[in-house]
């Protein structure tokens, strides 16, 4: 299952590997009629083969949160381990990378600009005792995922095994991936 916002390089690698892709569109906001972002994007993903658009689910608008939803809601996994989904930047990442999401976008903002500190706030993950930088997009993604986790059924257990980032808090257990695997192996 691939979302319409999957990185094109990942899609190309999957196709070269012979993976059959099933597309979905990850919805971001609640449907509020024609002014809704969901309505607008549903119009954008319509193609000749699919006049009604691609299948869509309410997922927080990003690939990681979509995978979390599919894991417990569709696949009925009781424990969902997040790997590589940190919704933040490492403090060691260059600010040019952070400000452009690693794209070649010409954005002119100095790190000393007061706006920079408001838009790119620093945080601390107590579960892994590490610092991170949140940009506006990752802040929103992290906030949505945390809210979805808190609202999920009590039987859903979310583990952050990414070993960093902004995903921690209520109903999220932070543990390194090796420990997660060892715990799962000892509790079949």
Label the predicted regions.
Residues 1-188:
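Metal-ion/cofactor- or nucleotide/acyl-coenzyme-handling active-site neighborhoods
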């Amino acid at each position: 299952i691939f979302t319409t916002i999957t990185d094109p390089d990942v899609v190309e690698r999957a196709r070269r590997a012979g993976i059959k892709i099933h597309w979905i569109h990850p919805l971001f906001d609640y449907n509020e009629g024609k002014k809704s972002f969901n309505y607008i994007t549903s119009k954008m993903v319509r193609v000749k083969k699919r006049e009604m658009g691609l299948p869509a689910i309410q997922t927080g608008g990003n690939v990681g949160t979509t995978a979390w939803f599919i894991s417990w809601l569709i696949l009925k996994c009781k424990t969902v381990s997040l790997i590589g989904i940190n919704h933040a930047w490492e403090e060691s990442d260059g600010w040019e990378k952070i400000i452009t999401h690693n794209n070649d976008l010409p954005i002119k903002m100095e790190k000393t600009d007061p706006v920079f500190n408001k838009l790119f706030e620093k945080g601390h993950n107590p579960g892994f005792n590490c610092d991170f930088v949140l940009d506006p997009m990752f802040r929103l993604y992290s906030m949505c995922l945390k809210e979805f986790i808190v609202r999920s059924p009590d039987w859903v257990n979310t583990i952050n095994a990414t070993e960093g980032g902004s995903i921690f808090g209520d109903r999220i257990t932070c543990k390194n991936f090796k420990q997660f695997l060892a715990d799962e192996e000892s509790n079949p």
